[in-house]
Structures are given as structure tokens and as C-alpha cells.
A protein has these predicted regions:
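Mobile genetic element proteins and their domesticated derivatives, centered on retroelements
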Residues: 19, 55, 69, 91, ...
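Conserved, non-catalytic sequence blocks in retroelement Pol enzymes and Pol-derived host proteins
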Residues: 44-50, 65-68, 79-84, 99-107, ...
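Conserved polymerase palm-domain catalytic core
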Residues: 202-297, 305-313
Length: 355
């Protein structure tokens, strides 16, 4: 029996309401858009028309075995269709028209949300033990992939993303995160310093991205009014239908967040956090806290080095409070139960750091 807010979901309608409220809990969360004034706007970038080559190169990497979309079209179908150059040209025209008009068709805004259980959970009476998988229409997904590729390369060219961000971006991976952390630890040991870290997890990160703030961040990043206008329309009036086993319900409005199945989720979420890390860095410098950061999508790591445990703990505690304050201004929250502190020492005897 699924429980939500202490009450059992006895009727299907109770379940649907619980699902929607749980996976869209941030829709009424406040933001502080004035926080963006702490960073300067980046130089405007030119947005060129899409090309047939961009579409052809993108669809090659799409796996035919992907889950079927709401429009029943597979990647294999689409690959066959674009062999006809006139069809490919029409797809490119649709994508360019979307940016010219600042419009994303309602057909592409409709999705299916499949609820699946997370593996190896002790109990499945809570919605936290389940994961939403969002299925989008295939042609819309293709255009999103092309847009995502374009955004990735443009933010790399203007260095908008923060150097600590190692997830959701091209040419960066979990391996880079491991290498960077190992480098921190070993260079600290060479200097006879203890390396201490605080790991935190942003709760329901993708469903919590505020659409209005995201459009302002895109403008700050230098994408210009054409791109900002497109995303203002892209993000609104989205709808999803929930599916649980053999049951379904049509449909709910979605006014916050990004579906993790969207090709735009990695880059848009990275852009969303870029300004957070730039602003966090300024606050840390003003407080004279010797803190470094690493980030992989929705997981953050605060790093400090010293010879004294209490000094490291004080720095981590102070910087963690800065993280919580700034994230709240971005409409985000930390899942405190997952926050952990780790100390990396080269002491070979019994190692028992203070709490």
C-alpha cells in the first residue's frame, strides 16, 4: 500500500494526485531572481540556422532499441524516413521555424510518465522507492538532441559553465571527478595536509528546475533574445500522463522541472547550476573560506585542506550553510539524509576524526 503524507492511497485518484504532487513538489517553491544580479552577463552569441548535417550526425547515435515513444515511432522509423532528403529538409525547417517563431509545438510538449520501482529497496510503500521515466515524442526528441548539441558547444566556447562542473557536459565524466578528487588528496598529502570533504545531494533536482529562472539564466549565458524566447515557450504548458502497471490517467500540467529523458536535461541543468557555483565562489571568497568544489550533475562536493580537524570541519560547516542559502534562492533543496563528511588522512595508525 502506497502512503503519501502519512495517508494510504486507497483510490486510484489518490495515487495519481500523490504521484503528481511528489514528482512536482517544487512547483510552488519560491525563487529569488535578484540573485542572478551577482553575476555579469556573458557576451551575446550568434545563433545560426540548423543544418541537415547536424540532424544526420545526431540521429546516427540514436539506438533503435530505445523505449517506444507516445507517437509509436521508433528511431529506426525516423532513420528510414530521413533517407528521403526532402523529409530531412522538412525536419530542419521545422526546427528553424521553432526558433524563428519562439514556439515549441504542443505535440512535442506531451509526454508519458512511466512509474517504475527502484531496485533493492527495503520497502515499496513510499513514492521515494519509485522512479518516473518520461517518454517523449520521437521527432521532438531528435530536435531536442540537435539543440542540446548546439548548446553544449556554445557554452564550452564562452566558458559559462563553472570549472568545478564535471557532469552533464561534453568531454567531462565521472572519471574526471575521480581524477580531480584523487589529485586533491595526494597533493594535500605531499604538503602534509589532511583533505576533508562534504558531499551533498540536491533533492529531486531535475523536477525542481524553475522555468522562469532558467530562461533568465540562458539570457545571462549570452544566448540572446531569440533563444531565450524559444525556451520561454518550450518550458510552458507541458502535460504528462501517468502510467502505473496497467493503470493510466490523462493528464496533468507540468509547470516546473525537466524530464530526465529529454536530451536537453543535461545541458540545461548544467547551465542552471553554473551561476550557482559562480555566485557560491564569490561568497566563499568574501568569507575567506579556503574551499574548493566539484560537481557531478546533482551531486556536489566541498573540499578543504588543513592540518587540523576542527579547522576543516568549521570550513565545511560554514560553506555548507552558504550552499543551503544559495540553493534555496534557486528553488532547490538538499536531501540532508545523504549529506556525508569524509576525511582522507595518510596516518597509518587508528584514525578516529572528531564529529
Amino acid at each position: 500500500m502506497i502512503k503519501y503524507n502519512g495517508s494510504s492511497c486507497l483510490e486510484l485518484n489518490d495515487l495519481w494526485q500523490a504521484l503528481h504532487s511528489s514528482f512536482n513538489s517544487a512547483q510552488f517553491r519560491s525563487i529569488d531572481k535578484l540573485i542572478l544580479n551577482e553575476c555579469d552577463s556573458f557576451s551575446p552569441m550568434t545563433w545560426l540556422k540548423f543544418s541537415e548535417e547536424e540532424f544526420s550526425c545526431t540521429i546516427i547515435n540514436c539506438k533503435d532499441s530505445s523505449a517506444p515513444s507516445p507517437d509509436k515511432m521508433s528511431w529506426g522509423h525516423l532513420k528510414h524516413i530521413i533517407k528521403d532528403k526532402s523529409c530531412l529538409k522538412n525536419f530542419v525547417c521545422i526546427a528553424n521555424a521553432c526558433f524563428d517563431l519562439g514556439h515549441w509545438p504542443n505535440h512535442f510538449k506531451e509526454s508519458k510518465t512511466i512509474i517504475i520501482p527502484k531496485p533493492n529497496k527495503f520497502s515499496y510503500d513510499s513514492l521515494k522507492s519509485f522512479r518516473p521515466i518520461v517518454l517523449l515524442n520521437t521527432l521532438g526528441k531528435l530536435i531536442e538532441k540537435v539543440i542540446g548539441e548546439r548548446l553544449q558547444f556554445q557554452v564550452i566556447s564562452n566558458n559559462f559553465t563553472h570549472q568545478s562542473q564535471l557532469g552533464g557536459l561534453k568531454f567531462k565524466s565521472t572519471t574526471d571527478t575521480d581524477i580531480a578528487l584523487t589529485h586533491f588528496i595526494r597533493t594535500g598529502w605531499v604538503k602534509n595536509l589532511l583533505t576533508s570533504t562534504l558531499a551533498f545531494d540536491i533533492a529531486q533536482f531535475f523536477p525542481s528546475l524553475n522555468h522562469h529562472l532558467l530562461s533568465l539564466i540562458l539570457d545571462k549565458a549570452g544566448f540572446g533574445p531569440q533563444v531565450a524566447r524559444f525556451f520561454l515557450n518550450y518550458l510552458i504548458n507541458r502535460k504528462t500522463s501517468y502510467y502505473w502497471n496497467n493503470f493510466s490517467l490523462h493528464s496533468f500540467d507540468i509547470n516546473v522541472g525537466m524530464g530526465q529523458s529529454s536530451a536537453l536535461s543535461p545541458i540545461l541543468s548544467a547551465l542552471y547550476l553554473s551561476l550557482f557555483f559562480h555566485i557560491f565562489e564569490k561568497h566563499i571568497k568574501n568569507l575567506d573560506l579556503k574551499i574548493s568544489t566539484l560537481s557531478f550533475v546533482d551531486n556536489g562536493l566541498l573540499i578543504t585542506q588543513s592540518k587540523l580537524f576542527h579547522l576543516s570541519n568549521d570550513r565545511l560547516f560554514s560553506s555548507y550553510n552558504v550552499v543551503l542559502t544559495l540553493l534555496s534562492k534557486f528553488g532547490l533543496q538538499v536531501e540532508h539524509s545523504k549529506t556525508k563528511v569524509f576525511h582522507f588522512s595518510r596516518v597509518y595508525s587508528t584514525f578516529n576524526p572528531p564529529p
